[in-house]
Amino acid sequence: MALPVEEWRRSAARCWAALEPALRERLAAAPLGEALRMGCGLFGPEEAALQRLCRRARTGKEPAAARFYREEGNRQFGRCCYRDAVRLYSQAAAHEPPRSPEVALCFANRSAALFHLGHFEVCLEDIARAESHGYPDRLLPKVLLRKAECLLRLGRLQDATDTLTAVENKMAVDGIMTSPIHRMLLKKLSQLKTEIHEGSCPEPAREADGDVQRESEIWEENGSISGASSSLSLNFSTERGRHLVASQDILPGQNLLKEKAFVSVLCPGEGDSLLLQDSSETVWDTRVTNADLYCHHCLKQLLASIPCCGCSYAKYCSQNCADVAWEQYHRTECPLGALLLTLGVFFHVALRTVLLAGFSEVSRLVEWSRDDSNKDLCNAEAGGEHPSEALDTRAGRKVIPGCNDNGQYQSSYQAVFNLLPHVEKHSPEHKFLCMLSIVAICKKLQETGLEAAVLNGESSTTGSEQKTCGKTSDELSPELMIMAEAMLRHVLQLQCNAQAITVMQELESGDGAVVNKKPVRLATAFFPVLSLLNHSCSPNISVSFSGTAATVRASQPIPSGQEIFHCYGEEMLCCSSEACAFSVSRERLSQRLLDLQQQMEKALELLRDSKADEAIKMLLKCQIDARNFLSPEHLLMGELEDHLAQVYATLGKWQEAARHLGRSIQLVEMHHGPSSVEMGHELFKLAQILFNGFAVSEALSTIQRAEEILSVHCGPQSTQIQELQEMKTCLLELPRSILQRT
C-alpha cells in the first residue's frame, strides 16, 4: 500500500471539499513550506479520525497475541509442520517483552523446530538467545542436550563433549531425578556420549548459502556517476531532463550500474493483514506477509527473525541489522508504527529518508531550495522556459542538478533531494492529502517527545522505554517544519521516482516437482542514480536485486549515443513509447475480468488442497468463459495455460503440462519479446517439466535458451542459472543409449 488507507483518503477529500474556494486556491498555489503552515491549522479536526484508524494497525507487544502464536506453534510442531512452527514461534517472540522468560521460551521452542529442519547453526544461535534472555534453569538440560546434538551433527566433537559435561554437572547438582522426562534426558545423554565415543557422527552438515549472487565481472567504474559503468554518460536537456546515454556500444548482458538504495522500506505485503477491520472481537492473523519473510533492514530472507525490542512489527535477520536499524532510524519510527502502516509506504520512505540524511543536511538543502537564486537550478528539468543547462552562479560554471561541487553525481541525499517532485502535475486534492499526512507524522513526533532525537540524531533508549514527554501544539517548530517540507517533497517525488525492489517468490502448489515463481514487490526505495533513467514501456535494460542493491544490465544491444530506458511500471508515468501508443477502455469489462481472476484463484486453492482434478475442471471452464470476451492473444489466456500446465505437472502428466506451457510461452513471447526476462522465467519452468518428463533432447535445448536469456537479465551467478546448469549436468551424465533414444 503506497498511499494511505481508503478511509483516510476519503476523510482528507471531505476536508478539502469543505474548504472555502479562495483557501483551496491559496493552498493549490502555495509553495510546499507555506502549504504546510496552513495545513497545521486544518489537521486538528481530522486528527481523531486518523487516530481511530491507527488503532486498527496493531504494532505493539500484546501478551494475548504471544500466547496465541506460541500455542499455534506448538500445534504445528506436534503435526511435524516445522517450517510453520518456526514462523509462529517468531511471531510469538515478537510480542513478548525482551529479556523475559517468555521470549526465552519462544527461542527455545523455535530452536527445536530448526533442529528438525536441519538448520543446526541457526538452532545453536536460538539456544544462545534463549539462555541470554533468562531461559528457566529447570528446563536448561533439555536445550543443552539439543545444543550438544547440533554440535555433533556439525562435526564439532570437542564442543559437543564440553556441552555434555556441562549437562552432566547440571543434572548432578540438581540431585536425583526419577521423573519420566528426566529418565528420557539421561537416556539421550548416554546415547550422545556413545556417538561421540564411537565417532559415529554424520558428515558435518552444510547450511544453505541462500540466494547469494557472486559478481565475477570486472568493469571500469564511471568517474562522474557513482556505481555506473564507464560506458555511460550523464546528459541534460529541457525535453528529457537528466538522462543516461551510452558513450560506447553496449552488448546484451553487460553490467551498466550497481547501486545500493539510499533508503528502502519493506512493503507489508499484498494482504495488508496488519490492518484489521473495526471489530469488538480480537482475531489474530496467521497469514504470512513480507513483514514475516524478510529482514526489515537489509531485506535478506528470514529464517529465525530477531524481533524489535519495542514493537511487534519490525523483524531482522541478525542482531547487527537490528542494532544498525535502531541507531539509524527505527528508534524514531518504532513508536509511530501504527501511523506509518496507516499512511502507507510512500510516507514511511519519506520519513526514513530525512532520518538517514540528518537534520543538518536536510536543513541545508531546504534552505538552498528556498533561495530565489537557486530556483532555476532546482526546476531546470521542469521544461518550458528554463535553459538546457542550469548555471551555478557561485561556481561560475554550468552544472547538472544533483551533482556535487566537483560535478559528480553520487548516490547521496543531495541527489535524492534534486529528484523532481513534479508539484505542478499532482492534483491539488492529492497534494492536500499528502500535506495533511506529513503534518500528522510531525505532530506525532512532537507529541511523543521524539523531536530532539530527530533533529540532533541523538541516541535514545529502547522502544519499550521511550518517554512520552512531548508537547501538543497546533503549530510545528521551525526545525520540524523544515523536516516536514523535505518529507512532503519526497512523497511527491516518489510518484515518479519510486523504485520497486522485487524478488522472485515461490508459489505454494502441488508436490514441488516444478517450482512456480512470480515477481513480488518487496520494498519501495530511492535509487538516485537509477532514477536518472527515463521511463519507457519498451526498456533496453533489466534490473535485478540482491537485498537493497540493484544491478542494471543491458537487455539488448545499445548503440553509442542511444538513451538508456527503464520501465517503472504502468501505474507510475505517462509514456510516449510505441508500446503505450494505444489504450483501450476496459471499464465495461473490468467486473467480468475480475470475476474470471477470482475463479482462477479458486482453482489454485483447489490445487493447494491437493484437489487437482477439480482444479482442472474449473480452469477449463475459465478458459471457455475467457474465450467469450477476451482475444486469443490476451495475457490472461496465457495465465490460464500456465496454471493448467502447473496442475498437470502436479499429476505427473509431463507431456500435457509441456503442451499447455508451450501455448503460454507463445503469448509471453508475443507480449514481452523473445529475449525478455518474462520469457526466461517461462522457459525455466518448461525446462523443469521436460527434465521431470525425461524428454532429454527437448530439455537440453530449452535449458540452453533459458540460460541465454536469464544470464543477460539476472547475471551468470543467479540461482535459476545454477539450477539450469545442475539439470543439464544431470541429463548429460545419463548413459549414451538413453541420450540416443531420446
Curated annotation (Swiss-Prot):
Q: State the name under which the record lists this protein.
A: Protein-lysine N-methyltransferase SMYD4
| Cellular compartment(s) | Nucleus; Cytoplasm
- At which positions is Zn(2+) 1 bound? 295, 298, 317, 321
Q: Does the keyword Cytoplasm feature in the UniProt annotation?
A: yes
Record's GO cellular component terms: cytoplasm; nucleus
Extract the Gene3D superfamilies matched here.
Tetratricopeptide repeat domain (1.25.40.10)
Zn finger spans (MYND-type):
295-334
Task: Tell me the PROSITE patterns matching this sequence.
Answer: SET, ZF_MYND_1, ZF_MYND_2
Q: Where's the SET domain?
A: 230-569
- One Pfam family assigned to this protein is zf-MYND
UniProt record similarity statement: Belongs to the class V-like SAM-binding methyltransferase superfamily.
Q: Which PANTHER family match?
A: SET AND MYND DOMAIN-CONTAINING PROTEIN 4
The UniProt record gives the binding positions of S-adenosyl-L-methionine as: 110-112, 418, 534-535, 568
What does the record give as the function of this protein? Protein-lysine N-methyltransferase. Monomethylates PRMT5, modulating its transcriptional activity. May also act as a histone methyltransferase. Plays a critical role in cardiac development. Acts as a key epigenetic regulator of gene expression during cardiac development via its dual activities as a methyltransferase and negative regulator of HDAC1.
CDD domains documented for this protein:
SET_SMYD4
Q: So where does Zn(2+) 2 get bound?
A: 308, 311, 330, 334
* InterPro entries attached to this UniProt entry: SET-MYND_domain_protein (IPR052097), SET_dom (IPR001214), SET_dom_sf (IPR046341), SMYD4_SET (IPR044421), TPR-like_helical_dom_sf (IPR011990), Znf_MYND (IPR002893)
Gene Ontology MF terms in the entry:
histone deacetylase binding; methyltransferase activity; zinc ion binding
The scientific name of the source species is Gallus gallus (Chicken)
Q: Which UniProt keywords apply?
A: Cytoplasm, Metal-binding, Methyltransferase, Nucleus, S-adenosyl-L-methionine, Transferase, Zinc, Zinc-finger
Residue ranges that the Swiss-Prot or TrEMBL entry lists as coiled coil: none
What does the record give as the reaction this protein catalyses? L-lysyl-[protein] + S-adenosyl-L-methionine = N(6)-methyl-L-lysyl-[protein] + S-adenosyl-L-homocysteine + H(+)
Entry EC no(s): 2.1.1.-
Q: Identify the gene encoding this protein.
A: SMYD4
Domain of life where this protein originates: Eukaryota
For whether the record's keyword set contains Metal-binding, the answer is yes
